[in-house]
């Protein structure tokens, strides 16, 4: 698997959700574009075999069980909401990079 190619594609696909013709992207918390981005990330991580669940405020948790210590957890985080006309890599790069790496 070419991780660089996969990561670039995922960044482009996620960036299209909430992209603004005036420049940048806007995915304010709890808006339709934010929810669509959450669902995109969920579908991508589930396709890689990770377990997913949302908490009561909309945080998406993705988990892959360890092979040696399946009950232990390492947490990492990022965000996909943006400010108005935010940059394309703001937050989502962390989400895309981590989930792509977990799939490798």
Language model features with spans:
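N-terminal capping segment at the start of a domain
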Residues: 1-31
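Homeobox/homeodomain signature
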Residues: 4-7, 18-20, 50, 70-73, ...
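Catalytic-core environment of secreted peptidases
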Residues: 44, 48, 60-93, 98
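Conserved small/polar residues in nucleotide/adenosyl-binding loops
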Residues: 100-104
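Generic secondary-structure boundary/loop-capping signal
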Residues: 11, 22-25, 57, 77-80, ...
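Generic alpha-helical scaffold signal
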Residues: 8, 31-39, 54-56, 70, ...
